[in-house]
């Protein structure tokens, strides 16, 4: 992590590269066969004592366990990395007790789960699922770094970005342990939350354009203040999301978490605002209801404040329901070990969704 900003391991940063090297050594020390796949995921395989299928090792059954080691700036200490280290501990336990599994076990550090400067989260798992498009791979950040080039730099080949992993039919299950990132388990006194679904996550760029002017000489009734229009939208979104969450009785949230004001001067009426909407829904109906009302909110604000409001879709990941059979196995395992468990929807996105 960055020494002066824990816990910070941005994807492709020197801290990320160092952590990847440490993890690869830890995988190898546990007897795992390590490789980096075409999408830049670090994978350590514990091979089962099975015969190849038609001479092909890739045709064997396998289970994937893992998470991610990258973070947001000043992120959580256990966010992501707990799932990778827990998966590695599973391997240590199997080795120490000489337990052979009837399938290959893959421990995965998925590349770049957190939202990054290229505007897309879950890079590795999206690539594995054939969802990392050429347009996304071709994006360039402010420093001129192309996403595809960074994946290649760390060992990926950037091939097959529009196709699902070739042995997907042989994957029996994907498991990901993760911190809750909330306080429900703590406040209710439960040990484990068994996730029922990962919500759909949708991001939109909102551009509000008015007219910059001198704050001292521009009359209040003759302003096209982009920030005031943006404030109208932000407040309305907050109220709308609260109403939908209550009425639908399902997980639904909407947040404006990033905002830029131009020219951004103390004595200047703001002429332009760029902001990002993050909307998450466990219900397709709730999503549709929100978007319909959101369109009206933007149109009304534009009319009232004499500004132009444009909305651009940035990213989308649909609702991912979890497998009922695996949920039951987790519930049974918790009971056998005397652990209190409840079922809940995940509010956060995860690699397993893809």
For the regions a language model picked out, list residue spans one by one:
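Active-site metal-coordination/substrate-binding segment of hydrolases
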Residues: 24, 28, 33, 43-152
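Flexible, glycine/charged-enriched surface loops at secondary-structure junctions
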Residues: 37, 100-101, 161-165, 217, ...
């Amino acid at each position: 992590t960055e020494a002066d900003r824990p816990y910070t391991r941005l994807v492709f940063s020197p801290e990320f590269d160092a952590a990847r090297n440490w993890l690869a050594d830890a995988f190898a020390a546990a007897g795992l066969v390590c490789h980096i796949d075409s999408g830049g995921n670090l994978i350590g395989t514990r091979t089962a004592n099975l015969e190849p299928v038609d001479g092909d090792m890739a045709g064997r059954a396998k289970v994937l366990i893992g998470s991610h080691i990258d973070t947001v700036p000043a992120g959580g200490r256990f966010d992501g990395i707990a799932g990778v280290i827990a998966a590695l501990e599973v391997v240590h336990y199997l080795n120490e007790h000489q337990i052979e599994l009837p399938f290959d076990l893959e421990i995965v550090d998925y590349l770049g789960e957190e939202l990054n400067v290229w505007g897309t989260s879950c890079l590795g798992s999206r690539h594995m699922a054939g969802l990392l498009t050429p347009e996304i791979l071709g994006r360039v950040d402010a420093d001129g770094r192309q996403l595809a080039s960074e994946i290649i730099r760390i060992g990926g080949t950037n091939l097959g970005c529009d196709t699902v992993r070739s042995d997907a039919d042989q994957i029996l299950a994907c498991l990901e342990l993760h911190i809750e990132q909330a306080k429900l388990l703590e406040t209710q006194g439960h040990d484990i939350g068994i996730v029922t679904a990962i919500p759909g996550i949708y991001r939109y760029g909102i551009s509000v354009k008015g007219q910059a002017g001198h704050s001292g000489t521009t009359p209040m009734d003759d302003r096209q203040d982009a920030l005031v229009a943006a404030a109208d939208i932000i407040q309305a979104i907050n109220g709308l999301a609260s109403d939908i969450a209550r009425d639908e009785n399902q997980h639904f949230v909407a947040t404006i978490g990033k905002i830029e004001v131009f020219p951004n001067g103390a004595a200047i009426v703001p002429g332009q605002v760029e902001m990002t909407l993050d909307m998450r829904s466990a219900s397709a109906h709730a999503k549709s209801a929100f978007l319909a009302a959101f369109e009206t909110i933007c149109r009304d604000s534009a009319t009232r404040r004499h500004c132009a409001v444009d909305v651009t879709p940035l990213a989308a990941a649909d609702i991912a329901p979890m497998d009922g059979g695996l949920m039951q196995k987790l519930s049974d395992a918790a009971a056998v070990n005397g652990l209190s468990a409840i079922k809940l929807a995940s509010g956060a996105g995860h690699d397993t969704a893809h």
